[in-house]
């Protein structure tokens, strides 16, 4: 059901040579970019009318309005299953605890007497958040996007999720209920690239946003790339990934269940086990069969994901080699199921999120650990981070110098300006001192 890659025996290659040996999904955003271009431009030129036409084309429902009425949000919350409401409320509570601690404070550094630099953190004015609604419905993604934006102090928050024909063109009621729980009352029935374009350009119903965040399919990722430079984005999120670094102490039942848990997202989802134990590899492979047979989404998601080129059991000589492999892979989710798992986890450099030991499965992080589940995919964990309060903040440097403080460093500024052949830069200093360079004290 899942392939094997044997990296034992020979020394592991370095850098890209090692990455090329590891499984990865085919996820070509560049190819999708040309297909989303006309969609985005239609929204630009036709506004709400284009959104309504695309909802009919892609979602099979003709909308009267893309803006979700307040009554629909209230009704969705009122009709929400009490157990689901309690679970969402706990997820929100835990997420707030973690994200509130991420707030940044203004800090001033006195560089010299009379000269200081202050770093002030300012939230983005307006954000557009996206919650997918394709194969599955993700109210948890509403929580993971809204909470850090709110804790960052963003004043204007809008959310989009695809129109559902089953619900009269509204987004899924659980999505709407999650919005109501979080106090988000600006919600739109728009999906995929159309939602990103709506937030980027603005329409008659929706003011443009400064930033768009949230997971989605390849069309969402392509639209984000299309608008890079015009608006801020969190990341071009691809199919979900789990990597498990495990040794002989790991429970194969746990490992198999965790691999399956992420494979059920998408046929392109990646499930990777890295281990130095052939016995564990055999046991996990054997355990996959009955667990897969006992769950849902077998033929359309789980089996294609596990059998795909993006999933594998990778055999290594030891935990040290396993660490090199998982760092080269840069998984969205990385579980450490080894002896002394915390110490091993401390050595990891590249991962979207790390889950330590047998009692911290990825599913916990998906819903209620308090961490954020909007994470870098496709190996981007080597340079990117998951969604956080920081994602919605901008650091502004405030420079405050007295005349004496400027005079003390003026000759250095002029020297560097002349070295770069930018004499007007130096002149801006000289102009303040009678067109002379003051002597430093």
Swiss-Prot record:
It is an enzyme of class 1 (oxidoreductase). Its EC number is 1.1.1.23. Its cofactor is Zn(2+). It holds the Pfam family Histidinol_dh. Zn(2+) binds at residues 262, 265, 366, 425. The active site is at 332 (proton acceptor), 333 (proton acceptor). Binds 1 zinc ion per subunit. Pathway: Amino-acid biosynthesis; L-histidine biosynthesis; L-histidine from 5-phospho-alpha-D-ribose 1-diphosphate: step 9/9. It catalyses: L-histidinol + 2 NAD(+) + H2O = L-histidine + 2 NADH + 3 H(+). One of its GO terms (biological process) is L-histidine biosynthetic process. Keywords: Amino-acid biosynthesis, Histidine biosynthesis, Metal-binding, NAD, Oxidoreductase, Zinc. Belongs to the histidinol dehydrogenase family. This is Histidinol dehydrogenase.
């Amino acid at each position: 059901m899942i392939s094997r890659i044997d990296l034992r025996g020979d020394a592991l290659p370095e850098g890209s040579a090692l990455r090329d040996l590891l499984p990865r999904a085919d996820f070509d955003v560049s190819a999708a970019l040309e297909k989303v271009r006309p969609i985005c431009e239609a929204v630009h030129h036709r506004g709400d009318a284009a959104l309504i036409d695309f909802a009919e084309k892609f979602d099979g429902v003709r909308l009267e309005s893309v803006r979700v009425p307040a009554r629909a949000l209230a009704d969705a919350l009122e009709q929400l299953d009490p157990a689901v409401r309690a679970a969402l409320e706990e997820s929100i509570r835990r997420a707030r605890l973690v994200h509130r601690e991420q707030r940044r404070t203004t800090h001033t550094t006195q560089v010299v007497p009379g000269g200081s630099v202050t770093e002030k953190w300012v939230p983005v004015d307006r954000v557009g958040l996206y919650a997918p609604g394709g194969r599955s419905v993700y109210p948890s993604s509403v929580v993971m996007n809204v909470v850090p934006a709110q804790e960052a102090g963003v004043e204007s928050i809008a959310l989009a999720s695809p129109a559902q024909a089953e619900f009269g063109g509204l987004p899924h009621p659980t999505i709407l209920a999650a919005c109501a729980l979080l106090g988000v009352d600006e919600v739109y029935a728009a999906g995929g690239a159309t939602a990103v374009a709506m937030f980027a350009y603005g329409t008659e119903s929706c003011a443009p946003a400064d930033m768009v965040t949230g997971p989605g399919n390849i069309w969402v990722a392509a639209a984000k790339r299309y608008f890079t430079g015009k608006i801020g984005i969190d990341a071009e999120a691809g199919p979900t990934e789990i990597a498990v670094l495990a040794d002989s102490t790991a429970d194969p039942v746990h490992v198999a269940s965790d691999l399956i848990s992420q494979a059920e997202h998408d046929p392109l989802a990646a499930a990777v086990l890295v281990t130095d134990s052939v016995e564990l590899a055999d046991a996990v492979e054997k355990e996959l069969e009955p667990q897969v047979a006992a769950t849902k989404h077998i033929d359309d998601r789980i089996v294609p994901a596990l059998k795909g080129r993006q999933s594998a059991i990778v055999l290594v000589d030891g935990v040290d080699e396993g660490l090199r492999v998982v760092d080269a892979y840069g998984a969205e989710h990385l579980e450490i199921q080894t002896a002394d798992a915390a110490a091993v986890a401390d050595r990891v450099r590249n991962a979207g999120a790390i889950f330590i030991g047998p009692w911290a499965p990825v599913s916990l992080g998906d819903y209620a650990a308090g961490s954020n589940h909007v994470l870098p995919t496709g190996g981007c964990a080597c340079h990117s981070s998951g969604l956080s309060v920081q994602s919605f903040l901008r650091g502004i440097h405030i420079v405050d110098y007295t005349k004496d403080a400027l005079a003390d460093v003026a000759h250095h500024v002029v020297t560097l300006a002349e070295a770069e052949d930018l004499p007007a830069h130096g002149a801006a200093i000289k102009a303040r001192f009678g067109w002379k360079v003051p002597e430093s004290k």
